[in-house]
Design a protein with these regions (language model features):
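Acyl-donor-binding surface of acyltransferase catalytic domains
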Residues: 109-110, 136-214, 224, 310-319, ...
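Short boundary/loop segments of OB/S1/cold-shock single-stranded nucleic-acid-binding domains
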Residues: 1-8
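A short macromolecule-binding patch
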Residues: 32-44
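SH3/SH3-like beta-barrel fold
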Residues: 23-29, 35
Length: 340
């Protein structure tokens, strides 16, 4: 954020910690800075800060990549579970702390089972990212209550640290409590990352790659989205700061055109997030998936985005990610009630 301070322009570079009607609190290297909103001249998005030396797509924390993913899949109902926010609500004030546990609810999508990703569960989840300012057991109970009150099947998203089998600090606090509360973990989902410059050279499409802003009914059908969930799911699809729907089109000998693959690529925090990548069974191992990855990476490059992430919920998709040259970054589990 660039703002005026005592008549001079100055910059505050960092993560927004709090927002009030009059100020932003930004975590900078020199400590928290309160920036008057009426003094802001301009602002722009920056990628997550590196945590160690290395390749750009490998040096961000798992927590930051979870924030990137959340920014591209944002339901209408979102809240940060933090003791300070609860205190603000008791005083009749708007919550202002943007840390702790991220709560998301999109109840119409709770029953959607997406084979290509965990997106429906993520939209109805509690994501522990930091200290909620209260005992973990209390935070878990409040998160479950918040989700159930909104008609969402509660999921608790836990994850490892980057390039490690160890759980993240926040996940370490909540994971031991889950089974006692009747939660069971999903199979692990592997988060992959890669530089867009390399993916952009992966494969030229044999057919046509068509871009659009919104999914067609056929997209919802191949993604397994029932009619009753499509309105809310459409909001999720378009919730990223920027996104594109990609369709791979094949032309038959008689000139008939058929969609043989589809994907969604979304952009936030100088990252591309590839999801909903599906290929028609008759077109697998024909390069359709690789062509969609290439097209996504080229769209990212055109926006100055240098890194891409992709989540693989099973061995087949993990093998595909490896074949594209992607690297494993961290793993995610969705804990859900055992009765679900």
């Amino acid at each position: 954020v660039r703002y005026t301070d005592n008549g001079s322009l100055t910059d505050a570079l960092g993560e927004v910690l709090e927002t009030t009607p009059t100020h932003l609190r930004i975590a900078t290297k020199r400590g928290p800075v309160d920036v008057p909103k009426d003094a802001i001249e301009t602002g722009h998005e920056i990628p997550p800060a590196p945590t160690r030396p290395g390749k750009l797509h490998e040096i961000v924390s798992a927590e930051d990549l979870r924030k990137v993913a959340a920014a591209t899949w944002s339901p209408r109902e979102i809240a940060w579970l933090h003791a300070d926010n609860l205190a603000s609500e008791l005083r009749g004030e708007d919550p202002k702390v943007l840390s702790g546990w991220l709560l998301r609810s999109a109840p119409a999508t709770s029953a959607v089972n997406i084979s290509a990703s965990n997106t429906s569960a993520a939209a109805n989840s509690a994501l522990p990212l930091g200290d909620p300012g209260m005992p973990t057991q209390e935070a878990l109970s409040l998160a479950v209550t918040w989700l159930k009150e909104r008609g969402s099947t509660p999921h608790i998203l836990i994850h490892t640290q980057a390039h490690s089998s160890e759980l993240s600090p926040a996940s370490q606090q909540v994971a031991p409590l889950l089974r006692g509360e009747g939660f069971v973990p999903s199979e692990p989902v592997t988060t992959f990352t890669a530089p867009t410059a390399e993916l952009a050279q992966l494969r030229e499409p044999d057919g046509e790659i068509v871009e659009s802003d919104t999914p067609a009914p056929l997209h919802y059908a191949v993604w397994g989205i029932e009619e009753s969930a499509r309105e809310e799911y459409s909001h999720l699809v378009s919730s990223a700061p920027q996104h594109r729907i990609l369709s791979a089109i094949a032309t038959g000998p008689d000139g008939t055109q058929t969609m043989v693959g589809a994907a969604r690529v979304a952009f936030a925090m100088k990252w591309a997030v590839l999801s909903h990548l599906v290929v028609h069974p008759d077109s697998r191992r024909a390069g359709v998936g690789s062509a969609l990855v290439t097209a996504s990476a080229r769209l990212a490059q055109a926006r100055g985005v240098r890194s891409l992430m992709y989540e693989a919920p099973d061995r087949e998709r993990s093998d595909f990610a490896h074949s594209c040259g992607m690297s494993e970054h961290h793993r995610v589990w969705m804990a859900q009630p055992a009765s679900e």
